[in-house]
Structures are given as C-alpha cells and as structure tokens.
C-alpha cells in the first residue's frame, strides 16, 4: 500500500538544498516520489514499506532541517 504524507520543515532555502534532500530521501528503499516546496516548507513523500514516516522525518532532520508539527 502506498502512503503519501506532507512534512512541514524549516531551513530549506535553495534549489541545491532541495536537490540534496530530494536525492537523500529518494534513495530510501520504498520511496516512490519526493516533492519539496520551498515557499511553504513542505516535503511531500509517496512511499511504501519498508520506508515509514518516522524514518523519512529522521532523514530530513539528519540533513539539518527542523520538522514543524
């Protein structure tokens, strides 16, 4: 089953940061699509097992961005 979640973040400001984060998340097994909106601070991810929301949020955090709840 494919899930889609939008994660709100802060700190993503450049196209290079978007490219790096997109590559990092896309390399996760189970991730199908990543869309990042700099203006709204949204990272929308389509994924299935073994990827999960917690592991995706951890990748964003490990890349240096904050998750906003």
Question: PLM features: residue spans?
Answer:
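Helix N-cap motif at beta-to-alpha junctions
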Residues: 48-53
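Compositionally biased, disordered extreme N-termini, encompassing classical targeting presequences
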Residues: 1-6
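Conserved short beta-strand edge segments in small beta-sheet-based binding/regulatory domains
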Residues: 64-69
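A generic structural motif
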Residues: 41-46
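Short acidic amphipathic segments
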Residues: 22-37
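Short, surface-exposed ligand-recognition loops at beta-strand->loop->(often short) alpha-helix junctions
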Residues: 7-17
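Short amphipathic alpha-helices in soluble, non-transmembrane regions
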Residues: 20-25, 55-63
């Amino acid at each position: 089953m494919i899930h889609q979640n939008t994660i709100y973040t802060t700190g993503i400001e450049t196209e290079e940061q978007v490219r790096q984060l997109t590559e990092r998340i896309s390399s996760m097994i189970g991730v199908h699509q990543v869309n990042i909106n700099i203006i709204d601070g949204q990272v929308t991810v389509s994924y299935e097992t073994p990827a999960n929301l917690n592991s995706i949020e951890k990748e964003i955090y490990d890349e240096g961005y904050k998750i906003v709840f």
